[in-house]
A protein has these predicted regions:
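Detector for C-terminal structural segments
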Residues: 1-161, 226, 259-260, 264-266, ...
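Generic recognition of flexible, low-complexity loop/linker segments
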Residues: 45-50, 89-92, 180-186, 193, ...
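Ordered hydrophobic segments in well-structured contexts
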Residues: 57-59, 193-195, 252-255, 261-266, ...
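Short, solvent-exposed loop/turn and secondary-structure capping segments
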Residues: 72-73, 114-118, 208-210, 229-232, ...
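Primarily extracytoplasmic ectodomains and periplasmic/lumenal surface modules that are beta-strand-rich
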Residues: 109-112, 205, 269-273
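Aromatic- and charge-enriched surface segment that lines or borders ligand/interaction sites
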Residues: 165-232, 264
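Extended Gly/Ser/Thr-rich low-complexity repeat segments
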Residues: 208-211, 216, 273-298
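Extended charged low-complexity segments that act as oligomerization/scaffolding linkers
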Residues: 222-225, 231-261
């Protein structure tokens, strides 16, 4: 199963849950394969009851956290679930008459604190900092939990749950065999279309001074497909491939409009259209594309590091963390190699007839990242209001 666990046959709420069906129900929710709010709630009830019945293996927990703060701290947004662990908290908090807000944490770093956007950023000591270094495209409203625009806006068009939309013939998808964007097959359909407007990113700068472009979003989309479907990469980063493939299977195509908006076509429906927008949102603007390209080269071609802890352990290489000078130095060497070879990733050379990065732009990116490393001795680069 998805969680490397398969439940036995269960009797839950007067109905039989077949062997392995708990896994199927979870993916049904994950992919939005329900026709109404009522059906979705029934699935939740069934899964909760089954989870309690199987609680030796399926962990259910209610967590209470406390976050002490001085009375002088003002403007702190408190999420109904996560408390101050939200992107607005430290962006808006202040102490009257002071230009500083001092925040303490139990640890700055542990053995599990790993700064890489593919298989890291998994513990609070990294995430609590990262949340203030990087602007997300969307985020759940602190008071309702409903997804909303943060630095990207979107429009949703859906034919679900019972009908489909035609995917335009000039939409593309990534082909892992040819390493190129190819037109979607004739007659391709999707349940929903989401149009993303990245105007608040484009033209602004990454922390190292280079302008944010659509190349950063597009590289991430291709990278995700490579990790999930390229046989050699799947062999190396198996855990990432297995967990990402179920959602990627529902993405049917991508298309750039003349005004630089990105259309995403997905087989996904939800009774709240904001959830469709959140589901379809591609990861793209967390780190600049040249860092991801260098890490891909380091992990899959040079085999001198790994994205995940499981791959790092299996192949006896570092679990790459860009905050550590040792690991950042490995990436810096690879950046130097990419610059020397004048590399422009295939994913950026031709996207539906558009070139998203020229050799000159790529060279400037490699140089800026290396200069950042020379100055900061790490490669944690993003685009939020604070930098590391």
């Amino acid at each position: 199963g998805y969680w490397q666990y398969e439940n036995p046959e269960l009797q839950v709420l007067g109905q039989t849950i077949g062997a392995g069906e708990l896994d199927d129900l979870g993916q049904t929710l994950y992919r939005g394969e329900f026709d109404s709010l009522e059906q979705r709630n029934d699935i939740y009830r069934t899964m909760t009851a089954a989870g309690l019945d199987e609680s030796v293996r399926v962990w259910l927990a209610t967590v209470d956290n406390s976050f002490p703060a001085l009375d002088s701290l003002t403007g702190l947004t408190r999420d109904l679930v996560a408390g101050p662990r939200n992107p607005w908290a430290l962006r808006e908090a202040y102490v009257e008459g002071s230009g500083d807000v001092r925040v303490g944490h139990q640890w700055v770093w542990t053995e599990r604190t790993t700064y890489n956007p593919v298989g890291g950023l998994g513990d609070v000591y990294a995430v609590d900092l990262w949340r203030n270094l990087s602007d997300p495209t969307l985020w759940n409203d602190a008071f309702t939990g409903i997804p909303q625009p943060f630095r990207a806006s979107y429009e949703v068009e859906t034919a679900g749950p019972e009908d489909t939309l035609e995917v335009p013939a000039d939409a593309v998808t990534w082909d892992v065999e040819s390493k190129a964007w190819v037109p979607v097959p004739a007659g391709t359909t999707a349940v929903s279309k989401v149009i993303f407007d990245y105007s608040d990113y484009l033209g602004a700068n990454w922390h190292h001074g280079q302008p944010i472009t659509l190349a950063d979003a597009v590289y991430s989309i291709a990278q995700g497909m490579e990790l999930a479907y390229d046989p050699e990469k799947v062999r190396i980063e198996t855990a990432i491939a297995v967990t990402s493939r179920p959602i990627l299977e529902t993405f049917k195509g991508y298309r750039l409009t003349e005004d630089d908006r990105l259309e995403v076509y997905v087989d996904y429906w939800h009774f709240d259209e904001d959830h469709i927008g959140a589901y379809a949102s591609p990861v793209g603007f967390d780190m600049p594309w040249e860092l991801k390209a260098a890490m891909d080269e380091l992990v899959f071609e040079e085999r001198r590091a790994a994205y995940s802890d499981t791959a790092a352990s299996r192949f006896s290489v570092p679990w790459i963390s860009l905050v550590l000078e040792r690991d950042a130095n490995l990436v810096d060497r690879t950046l130097r190699k990419l610059a020397r070879e004048e590399t422009v990733p295939a994913a950026l050379a031709d996207f539906g007839g558009r070139t998203l990065a020229t050799p000159e732009e790529a060279a400037a990116r490699y140089e800026a990242a290396r200069e950042w490393f020379d100055e900061k001795e790490h490669l944690v680069i993003s685009q939020g209001p604070f930098y590391l």
